Amino acid sequence: MPKNTICLWYEHDAEEAARFYAETFPQSSLGAVFRAPADYPDGKAGDALTVEFTVAGIPCIGLNGGPQFKHSEAFSFQIATDDQEETDRYWNAIVGNGGQESQCGWCKDKWGISWQITPRVLTDALAKGGDAAKRAFEAMMPMKKIDVAAIEAAVRG
């Protein structure tokens, strides 16, 4: 186990979430599933208690802890994309699997985890600053899923 791992709290379906992430994102995998050795307040002996997985190279643990805690936008995974096809693939996988759209390239999966599906053309423009950054930013603001061609056009002016 790595020295630093992100632990995500799930109600009871960390294993399902980890499998989805492993199937959806590159450099992602499902690792060990640790089963509860005895009954606990929100589960029974033999239920998946923790699940080790990797999302885009980031080590994580999913903890099936019950309904006490909910996810918020205060934590999100940001996935950099190279083109519209890649942006669409991740966005559609998340939203099409019971997730929901939000603004400015953000969406939530069906477990409540927030994702930023962010084309590099946008982050590159913002990093450079100046008028092109302002135009790219203004073009992004009304979008849900980012339209790469619209951002490219905004950068060009």
Please tell me what each predicted stretch does:
Residues Y40, E73, R156-G157:
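A charge-rich, low-complexity, intrinsically flexible signal that marks solvent-exposed coils, linkers
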Residues T5-C7, T50, S76-Q78:
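Short aromatic/hydrophobic contact patches that present stacked aromatics
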Residues L8-G57:
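Core segments of cupin and vicinal oxygen chelate
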